[in-house]
Amino acid sequence: MKPVSHALIWHWGAPAVVVHQFPVRHATPQAVAEALAAGRSTEVVTGHIGLDTYIEQGGYRLLQQCHAGERSADSVIQALEGAGLRGLGGAGFPAGRKWRIVREQPAPRLLAVNADEGEPGTFKDRWLLERDPHRLLEGVFIAAWAVGVDKVFIYLRDEYPGCRALLLHELDRLQAQPPVPGLPAVELRRGAGAYVCGEESAMIESIEGRRGLPRLRPPYVAERGLFGRPTLVHNVETLFWVREIVDRGSAWFAAQGRHGRSGLRRFSVSGRVAQPGVKLAPAGITLRELIDEYCGGMQPGHELYAYLPGGASGGILPARLADVPMDFDSLQPYGCFIGSAAVIVLSQHDRAVDAARNVMRFFAHESCGQCTPCRAGTAKAVALMAQPVWHAPLLAELGQVMRDASICGLGQAAPNIVDGVLAHFAHEVAP
């Protein structure tokens, strides 16, 4: 059996090995043997900002102002709109507009937090949860107040047992010591382990107890989502920004970008850089700037060769395009998108074709099988890409069919990396 790329989500600590549910980062045979001998099976998250410390640092003050009538729901939504905050999980839909759409729907309304984080190369949401869970929760409660939400569901990746235990503990603390009366109930749901459950309608199917299959749209989840009710769906990082944007003002956030872009975002950087990890950087930063200013440059003996700007689904670009601003829409002319900002850096010791084959095997493995273009298309692409010389016209035609006819973004985005290899690394697959 050929190896399949599963996102272990410890990319910044590669090579990583998971012993039961205990991650061994920068793994060596000795370190793995020690973990086995010690019987370590679960990671315990420590060092996070707990409830008492969060309150001492001004946490939940904004939520209290909202409930006391010092802030109006419309002013909070206007702050998000003025800041230009967009969904930071992949689609990039304007957050303020989404709040208005759901708010205008008939009650009862629900909120679903997508913490599934299945895109290979992405680990920023886990990083945030392990450090400052109450900043997320305050964003959740402010959104629930502004939109009029009755109940919140947090769909958490099952490979994050430490985050789950942490959130359960902090939610118990909030129940015993609520910052405001009448907080909506929050229910944690374990992710089903499928990549496709990161798609919002598939996630909703999974929360409802069914197999995570994407829905045909319309209706959209903002109109008919969880249990048939209007549902606000947000990624962890999007909600993480709510408190700071409203506190500091939309103008502050909008002024942070580079190269004509606006805002800040967290990049999950892995690969051949000297200092991988989660990097808070201006929207629109270029890869070259990101590597030089935030990652300590490339690793010794490695030169930039290629990069994936948006994880497995975001396509691939060569080093000569390392000065393209990385933000929504700016990468589309090159057949790529930023998605969840999972930046994977390759050097001259890597081959783009190997990355592409690994990515397509991942998509073929993770296809839910509901629609033929994705189910059969990814399998056919794997077979065609296994050849030493690629049949470019056939792969291009296959990719177009997948984009046009697949139900969800998995099948629509899977051909991106194929197109990138053919456009920029044809020498690797040519006769």
Model regions and ranges:
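Ferredoxin-type iron-sulfur electron-transfer modules in oxidoreductases and energy-metabolism complexes
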Residues: 1-2, 18-36, 61-80, 107-109, ...
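Short acidic, glycine/serine/threonine-rich loops at helix termini
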Residues: 13-18, 91-92, 96-99, 122-125, ...
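Flexible inter-domain linker/hinge segments
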Residues: 34-82, 234-237, 241-249
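Gly-rich Lys/Arg/Thr-decorated short loops/hinges at beta-loop-alpha junctions or inter-strand turns
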Residues: 54-61, 113-125, 221-226, 268-273
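Conserved phosphate/anionic-ligand binding catalytic regions in large, soluble enzymes, centered on
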Residues: 80-101, 193-205, 209, 364-376, ...
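Histidine-anchored nucleotide/phosphate-binding helix
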Residues: 132-146
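Short amphipathic, charge-patterned alpha-helical segments
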Residues: 139-143, 283-300
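Hydrophobic alpha-helical positions that pack around
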Residues: 164-283, 295
